[in-house]
């Protein structure tokens, strides 16, 4: 098994739902850590530095959900349907139980998996997340949409949303982008505009204020680590505290001078925190 993300080839697995899922595996271990990706992200939009630190002690699996990147099928426009597609991937991989790390929209999907298939999740990490039905989550601010929602988002938009405006955070963002773009062979297919539209519809529906749905997340009984950057403009940090307060076995950490991409900027610290949490 490859020990670095840069050396991990893209493989495919066929699921019972008729979808061929693109995925990569890095590291070794009995129980996998499955990663669920952010808005518009494919296999290549993860910082290899984070994957490599996580994979030093465990088997890490990254994959494109239905309709994303090289995976076949169509991206649905609800989080619940995305979670069903993710569970179909786990079944195709013959993974009965995993630790799950969801980032951004991937954290919404991770919550839904923990609620709909609780036996499949041992421990849950929710990065840049919010509970369904939270007030103020129905859509993003115009400057955020302009930065990451355009037809061809560039590095300037990523730096604006994923990193704090400080020189240190912006420099860390440039370094992370350099690592992400370093892979030249076997790169994933770009995420389509149709997937972008479907994912944003799902995010907006997740954020419709609804108090009964807000309470749903309290049914998650596994240990949960909630994390975010202190300057995230996409999913504001106070939602991390709300989420952790609703989940019985949750802990929360906010990383300083960072934003939506805090886990890339602080990859060493975050990976160490995840390692300690998963081994607790």
Predicted regions: what they are:
Residues 102, 106, 110:
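Gly/Ala-rich beta-loop-alpha elbow adjacent to hydrolase catalytic centers
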Residues 61-101, 272:
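Active-site loop/oxyanion-hole signature of alpha/beta-hydrolase fold enzymes
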Residues 9, 187-213:
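Hydrophobic, aromatic-rich cap/lid helix
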Residues 15-72:
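Conserved HGGG/HGGXW glycine-rich cap/lid loop of the alpha/beta-hydrolase fold
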Residues 250-280:
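Catalytic active-site module of serine/aspartate enzymes centered on a nucleophile-bearing elbow/loop
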Residues 220, 226-228:
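Short beta-strand/loop motif that positions the catalytic acidic residue
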Residues 115, 122-154:
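Flexible "cap/lid" loop of the alpha/beta hydrolase fold
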Residues 231-235:
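Acidic catalytic loop of the alpha/beta-hydrolase fold
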């Amino acid at each position: 098994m490859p020990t670095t993300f840069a050396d991990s080839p893209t493989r495919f697995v066929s699921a019972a739902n008729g979808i061929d899922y693109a995925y990569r595996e890095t590291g070794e271990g009995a129980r996998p850590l499955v990663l669920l990706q952010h808005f518009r992200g494919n296999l290549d939009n993860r910082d290899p530095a984070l994957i490599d630190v996580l994979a030093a002690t465990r088997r890490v699996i990254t994959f494109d959900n239905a309709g994303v990147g090289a995976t076949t099928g169509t991206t649905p426009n609800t989080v619940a349907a995305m979670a069903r597609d993710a569970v179909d991937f786990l079944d195709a991989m013959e993974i009965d139980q995993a630790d799950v790390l969801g980032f951004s929209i991937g954290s919404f999907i991770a919550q839904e998996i923990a609620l709909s298939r609780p036996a499949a999740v041992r421990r849950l990490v929710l990065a840049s997340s919010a509970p369904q039905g939270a007030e103020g989550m129905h859509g993003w601010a115009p400057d955020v949409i302009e930065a990451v929602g355009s037809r061809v988002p560039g590095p300037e938009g990523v730096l604006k949303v994923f990193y704090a405006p400080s020189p240190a955070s912006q420099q860390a963002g440039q370094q992370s982008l350099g690592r992400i773009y370093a892979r030249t062979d076997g790169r994933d297919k770009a995420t389509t505009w149709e997937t972008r539209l479907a994912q944003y519809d799902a995010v907006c529906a997740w954020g419709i204020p609804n108090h009964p749905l807000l309470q749903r997340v309290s049914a998650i009984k596994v240990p949960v680590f909630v994390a975010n950057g202190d300057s995230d403009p996409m999913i504001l940090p106070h939602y991390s505290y709300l989420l952790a307060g609703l989940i019985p076995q949750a802990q929360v950490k906010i990383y300083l001078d960072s934003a939506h991409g805090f886990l890339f900027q602080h990859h060493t610290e975050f990976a160490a925190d995840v390692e300690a949490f998963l081994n607790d």
